[in-house]
Structure formats: structure tokens, C-alpha cells
Amino acid sequence: PLTPTPTTPTPYDPNTPPFTGPCTYWMMHPGVIWGLFGFWCPLVRLFGPSAAVPFGHDLTVPEALANTREDGMGALYREGTASLLNSMVNNRFPFTTQEVKDAFGAALNSGDDGAAAAQARLFKKANEGHVIRQN
């Protein structure tokens, strides 16, 4: 019988041609996430301690992308996480990694589900390639 040879994920070079992906891309390509961090990184290590409020300290990047909450906070976690990943692998993504972190934190700390939903919609548009970076 043939034994499959495991492959090692390779990190993406942000200077390669433009790359963005919606939540579904990242959920279907966990090896790329693993290649970025080398482990299933908890969201609190990326977004800071306030990211633990709705989901707890142990929520990982893949879990944030796959969360099924239908409110603004659930959408913020899905789309914000995808935006963070996109900003890390594509230097042409409309937001820098710091801008994603700041906007995510502001929406989360507002305590307003409507603000979280509005920010999630903007992240979703960016993830789908419908937002152009303003220089």
C-alpha cells in the first residue's frame, strides 16, 4: 500500500501577486493558517485580551472563522479574523494588520452589536475584494 507523504505548509510572501480570501477560503485551507503561525493560534494572541470576552481565551483562528453566531459579534469574529489573515499575507489588502486590529478592537469594545455588524460588513467587503486601499 502507498503511504501518503505529509507536506509542510509554506508561508506566503506578501510581495507575491494580490491575494485575498473570504472566510470560506481560510476555513478550507487550514494549512495556510498553520504556515503563518506554526500552531492553532488563540485569537487573544492576535487581537489582545479583549478578544476573549464573547468566546473565551481558548478560541483559535479556525474556530473564530467557523463560529456560527448570527449576531454582529459572530460576524465580526469571522470577518475580522479573515481580514487579519488577508492583511498578513497580502501587502495590497485594503487594511494593514494594525488597522484590522484597531478596527476589530474598537467594534468589540463598543459593546454595540450594531457597530460590530457594521465593521464585519466592511471587513467582508474587503475580504471579497470589494474595497480599494486608499493611499
Spell out what each predicted region is.
Residues D13-N15, D58, D71, D102, ...:
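Acidic-enriched, low-complexity/disordered segments with a strong bias for Aspartate over Glutamate
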Residues T60-P62:
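Short, structural beta-strand-to-alpha-helix junction motif
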Residues L85-V89, L108:
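Sec/Tat-exported extracytoplasmic proteins
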Residues A64-Y77, S87:
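Mature extracytoplasmic domains of secretory-pathway proteins
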Residues P1-D58, F123, G129-N135:
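Plant P/S/T-rich low-complexity glycomodules
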Residues F93-N135:
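Alpha-helical bundle/repeat cores within regulatory domains of eukaryotic proteins
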